[in-house]
Regions:
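Solvent-exposed beta-strand sheet faces enriched in polar/charged residues
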Residues: 35, 99-101, 206
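Short, flexible, glycine/charge-rich loop motifs used to bind or transfer phosphoryl groups or to couple energy/partner
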Residues: 22-23, 52, 95, 106-107, ...
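Residues at the C-termini of beta-strands that transition into short coil/loop
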Residues: 65-68, 102, 108, 167-168, ...
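Rossmann-like dinucleotide-binding core of oxidoreductases
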Residues: 2-4, 8-9, 14, 18-21, ...
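Glycine-rich active-site loop/strand segments that organize a redox cofactor
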Residues: 37, 42-87, 210-226
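Feature captures the FAD/FMN-dependent oxidoreductase FAD-binding
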Residues: 71-144
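Conserved beta-strand scaffold positions in the cores of enzyme catalytic domains, especially
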Residues: 61, 98-99, 161-164
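FAD-dinucleotide binding site
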Residues: 2-4, 26-29, 47-48, 57, ...
């Protein structure tokens, strides 16, 4: 059978939850369903668990305008952001609108009936569920959750150590007393380096092009005063 909703949202991360909350506030009579492939709220902030994961933007502008960020830290850690998203979803009741374990496989607009036709696989049953909706919001982000970018390096098969991608950080990875090389100097690398130095014997960063790094306070005195 085909399930119809006024609005279908793909993804229960910060964008999907934010969109659902806005709809709940502004259009309370509209039916909403969130299709989430994974089994947890939070998207990126639930998936990524590497040491020191935090926001790259200040939370006062990154957070929701209808539920302002109230913690003192401007650049919040991943656990705090995940908790913030989950608490917001619960407070506005949109957590009850989420259908976990649904992988959207097709989404097609039909001009004949002016509806979106969406197919999603239920990973618990293996069955493909059919949905129609007046509006479809894609809030799945830009990461490939199955396979983050992973270049192959010549000679890596001869390397006797462990190669780790931050997107798939092993829960019990033990790097204490080991020499670590971090390839790249983007936001993830800048976060990883200082958070690995306490345990690792030595941490080196390799970068292709020089960059500028500016240390900013974790707590903004102006925001704190306000």
């Amino acid at each position: 059978s085909v399930q119809h909703q006024d609005v279908l949202i793909i993804g229960a991360g910060i964008s999907g939850i934010g969109a659902a909350c806005h709809l709940k506030r502004e259009c309370p009579n509209k039916s909403i369903v969130i299709l989430e492939r994974r089994h947890a709220v939070g998207g990126t902030w639930d998936l990524f668990r590497y040491p020191g994961i935090r926001s790259d933007s200040d939370m006062y502008t990154f957070g929701f305008n209808f539920k302002p960020w109230t913690e003192a830290r401007v650049l919040a850690d991943g656990d705090s952001i995940r908790g913030y998203v989950r608490k917001t979803a619960e407070e506005y009741g949109v957590d009850q609108k989420i259908r976990f374990g649904r992988k959207v496989v097709t989404a097609n607009w039909s001009s004949a009936d002016n509806l979106w036709h969406v197919a999603a696989v239920n990973d618990a049953t293996g069955e493909t569920e059919q949905y129609t909706a007046n509006f479809l919001l894609g809030c799945s982000g830009y990461y490939n959750y199955d396979a983050g970018f992973r270049p192959e390096f010549p000679g890596e098969a001869d390397f006797q150590g462990q190669i780790v991608h931050p997107q798939f950080w092993p829960e019990n990875l033990d790097y204490a007393g080991k020499k670590v090389v971090i390839i790249g100097s983007g936001a993830t690398a800048i976060t990883l380096v200082p958070n690995m130095t306490d345990k690792a014997a030595h941490v080196s960063m390799l970068q292709r092009s020089p960059t500028y790094t500016l240390s900013v306070p974790a707590i903004d005195p102006v925001s704190k005063a306000l």
